């Protein structure tokens, strides 16, 4: 999109060979997870929830309800004007949607998603699909240089965040 955000992520970003970079502008992208429960101390403006599963249960006394409560605590740190971008394809996330107390935008492959991938085609190391946007303009055609449903879902989440930030379609794609 032409931005150079600051980022801190768990793995190395292939395009720059780093897992963190001090960028320019107003955006900071942090990959936060529930592994040590420290995500509960963050105060994001927009939070993306891709899935909630029983990884790292030891941090939560092997109690899945405590893990879910940790996510709700994290999302409760969003300001009143903040947004949750949530994968409606994940059954646990879908069950918790009514408990999210902030504006919530869903993404996924299911028809009920606000940002829905359809006509997904994978060929070799590439994927292409159309994004049907319920509330944000016309469909977008997307081509990724990586295969896999998880990459399609991650792209949908990024498109939803960019749309929420009023970034023009031409910059998103």
Region locations from a protein language model:
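Short beta-strand-centered segment that lines the nucleotide-binding/catalytic pocket of NTP-utilizing
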Residues: 3-16
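General beta-strand structural signal in soluble alpha/beta enzymes
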Residues: 6-9, 31, 85-86, 106-107
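Acidic, Mg2+-coordinating active-site environments of NTP-dependent enzymes
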Residues: 15, 48-173
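Conserved phosphate-binding catalytic cores of ATP/NTP-utilizing and phosphoryl-transfer enzymes
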Residues: 16-21, 26, 151
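Switch II (G3) loop of P-loop NTPases
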Residues: 26-36
């Amino acid at each position: 999109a032409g931005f150079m955000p600051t980022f801190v992520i768990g793995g190395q970003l292939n395009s720059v060979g780093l897992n963190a970079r001090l960028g320019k502008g107003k955006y900071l992208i942090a990959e936060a997870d529930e592994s040590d429960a420290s995500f509960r101390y963050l105060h994001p403006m927009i939070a993306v929830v891709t899935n909630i599963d029983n990884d790292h249960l030891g941090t939560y006394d092997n109690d899945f309800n405590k893990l879910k409560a940790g996510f709700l605590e994290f999302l409760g740190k969003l300001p009143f004007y903040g947004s949750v971008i949530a994968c409606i394809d994940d059954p646990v996330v879908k069950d918790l949607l009514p408990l999210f107390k902030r504006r919530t935008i869903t993404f996924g492959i299911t028809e009920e998603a606000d940002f829905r991938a359809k006509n997904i085609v994978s060929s070799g190391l590439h994927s292409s699909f159309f994004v049907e946007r319920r509330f944000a303009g016309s469909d977008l055609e997307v081509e990724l240089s990586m295969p896999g449903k998880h990459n399609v879902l991650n792209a949908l989440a990024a498109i939803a965040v960019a749309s929420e930030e009023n970034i023009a379609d031409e910059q998103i794609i």
